Structure formats: C-alpha cells, structure tokens
C-alpha cells in the first residue's frame, strides 16, 4: 500500500455536494446519503490504488483542467462514479459503475440527458480514447491518467499499489500483462488530449512509462 493515508471522507463530501448542486435544479434530495454510499465504496478493502487518494487526485486534476470541459461539474460527478465499482479480478467494473450512476443520479435530481452524459464518461474510462471534439471526455481521461506523469516517488507508489491490487496474479503473468499495457500506451500518438495535459504531462509520463518498462524487463518479480 502507498506510504500515506487516504484523505478523510469529510474533506471529500463537500466536493460531491458542490458538483451535484452545480448539475441539478435547486431543491433536490439531500446529497449526503449519495456521497456516503460512494465514499464507502471507495474505501473497500480490496483497493490499493483505486482509493480515496486516487479519487481526490482525479478531482484535483479536473479542477486544473475545468476550462477545457463543456460541463465540468458533470465531469466531476463522472470522476466520483468512474471506479465506484471496483474488483481487480473482474473486467466489467466500468460498466457496473456506469449502471450505478444511471440508477443513483436521476434519484439525486439530475436530468436524463445529464445522467446519460455522466454514464457515457464513466464508460469512456475503459479505453481513455475520447473523440477530438469530446471536451468533457478529454478532461476526465486526462485527469484519470495524470498519475502517469507523477514525480518518480509518487509513480513508484502507484506501480506498487497496482501490483498489490493484482496480488492474485503470478509474477511472470503480471509482468507480461503490465508490459503489454505500457507498450500500448507508449504507442499512442498522444497520452493526453487537453492542451494543458499535452504540454505539462506528456513528456514526463512517457519517461515514467519507459522507465517502468525497463524495470519490468529486469526485475525478478
């Protein structure tokens, strides 16, 4: 597990409320139960990387990138839901997270079109491949991938936490699978789609990916 504590849920609850209130008409249901349900999910014991620390980082990065989004509060809601369902040994986490958003958000007061947009954004995190005119998608995907551009110690914490989430995978199989993912990322013409992400994160992210790929080739497991 990374050598730091996750943020306190109380620090995140107001951020949920602001995003929800910014996306719905006044007078909707109390936001707190919805926040508490999501916060409980983000603190499940099987998580090592996909924790409140990751959620906070994605929200912080959306704050940096918000001018590039069409509806930044919907992007923030998508961040809350994008890993709300997370089991490392399952492949349908994003789809199940999108379904959760489709059930919860209309009850919380969002319109059908806005709910559909949040669910679409959640599903986009399967590929992290937003269209050139998908400003909301570009912001969410860049915010989610920004960890790739972290300073070396934080990136090392990230890779350690990912390995811990996949502790059930044998070392050799993990190395092969992780290396394939890193090569796929390095083969992309652009990791980041917003002007800010491309300018500030692209080069450092590629350096981190190349370093990890080299380490995977020589590490014993």
Residue ranges of predicted features:
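Divalent metal-dependent phosphate-bond-processing catalytic cores, especially two-metal-ion Mg2+/Mn2+ enzymes
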Residues: 1-25, 43-50, 61-71, 81, ...
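Active-site metal-coordination segments of metallo-dependent hydrolases
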Residues: 44-54, 86-98, 112
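Short, flexible active-site-proximal loops enriched in glycine and acidic residues
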Residues: 68-74, 90-93, 110-114
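An amphipathic alpha-helix signature
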Residues: 13, 17, 32-36, 59, ...
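His-Asp-centered metal-binding catalytic motifs of divalent-metal-dependent phosphohydrolases/nucleases
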Residues: 58, 73-88, 97, 122-126
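Short, well-structured alpha-helical segments
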Residues: 31-39, 52, 72, 76, ...
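Histidine- and acidic-residue-rich, metal-dependent catalytic cores
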Residues: 41, 97-131, 183-185
């Amino acid at each position: 597990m990374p050598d730091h504590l996750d943020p306190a849920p109380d620090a995140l609850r107001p951020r949920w409320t602001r995003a929800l209130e910014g996306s719905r008409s006044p007078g909707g249901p109390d936001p707190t139960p919805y926040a508490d349900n999501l916060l409980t999910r983000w603190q499940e014991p099987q998580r090592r990387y996909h924790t409140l620390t990751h959620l906070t980082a994605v929200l912080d990065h959306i704050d940096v990138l918000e001018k590039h989004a069409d509806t930044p509060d919907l992007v923030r809601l998508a961040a809350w839901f994008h890993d709300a369902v997370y089991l490392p040994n399952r492949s349908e986490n994003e789809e199940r997270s999108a379904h959760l958003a489709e059930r919860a958000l209309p009850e919380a007061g969002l319109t059908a079109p806005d709910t559909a947009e949040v669910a679409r954004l959640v599903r986009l995190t399967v590929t992290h491949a937003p269209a050139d005119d998908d400003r909301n998608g570009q912001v969410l995907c860049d915010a989610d991938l920004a960890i790739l551009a972290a300073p070396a110690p934080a990136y090392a914490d990230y890779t350690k936490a990912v390995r811990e989430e996949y502790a059930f995978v044998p070392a050799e199989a993990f190395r092969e699978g992780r290396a394939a993912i890193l090569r796929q990322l390095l083969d992309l013409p652009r990791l980041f789609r917003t002007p800010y992400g491309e300018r500030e994160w692209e080069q450092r992210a590629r350096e981190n990916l190349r370093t990890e790929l080299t380490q995977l080739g020589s590490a014993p497991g």
